[in-house]
């Protein structure tokens, strides 16, 4: 994330589009919640947003709506592990959090129709009947999954490194 963070901070187009959202208190709270493995919800959303922004820009799609919606797509602000019981949710997190994220996003900025679709449909194909209406909505379904896989990859590499160092320490003894 460090290399990507430098890229993001140096991309004035991206920062001009999402800067106001990044400074929002509610968005900053995403740093307090773990999304996948050791990745915060904030870092995950930032990675998805920037990667989606780049793809949409190259494909001459609506990269502004994409960057903003992708940054807000997981703005649910709770620990989702075991959340259905703990929070008395009517449905599983995978199915309900896009609606919670949209409600929270609407509290902090105006959300256009495309941004709404991007946020609500980002879990497709898990939410099978919520088919993406726009190309941007489909793109986030891919970048979101790739970001999750990237978090998993980093987690496994870190575990392997710890295991290797522990083994190496035993050999040196």
Spans of features found by a protein language model:
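Metal-dependent phosphohydrolase cores
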Residues: 1-173
């Amino acid at each position: 994330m460090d290399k990507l963070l430098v890229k993001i901070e140096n991309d004035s187009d991206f920062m001009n589009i999402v800067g106001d959202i990044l400074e929002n208190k509610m968005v900053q709270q995403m740093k307090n919640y773990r999304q996948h493995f050791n990745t915060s919800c904030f870092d995950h959303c930032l990675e998805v947003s920037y990667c989606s922004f780049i793809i949409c820009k190259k494909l001459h799609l609506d990269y502004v709506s994409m960057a903003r919606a992708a940054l807000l797509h997981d703005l649910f602000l709770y620990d989702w592990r075991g959340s259905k019981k703990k929070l008395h949710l009517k449905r599983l997190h995978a199915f309900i959090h896009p609606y919670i994220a949209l409600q929270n996003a609407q509290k902090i900025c105006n959300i256009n129709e495309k941004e709404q679709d991007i946020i609500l449909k980002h879990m497709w194909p898990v939410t099978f009947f919520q088919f993406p209406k726009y190309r941007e909505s489909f793109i986030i379904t891919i970048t979101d999954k790739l970001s999750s896989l990237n978090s998993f990859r980093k987690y496994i590499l870190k575990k392997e490194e710890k295991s290797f160092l522990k083994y190496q320490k035993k050999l040196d003894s």
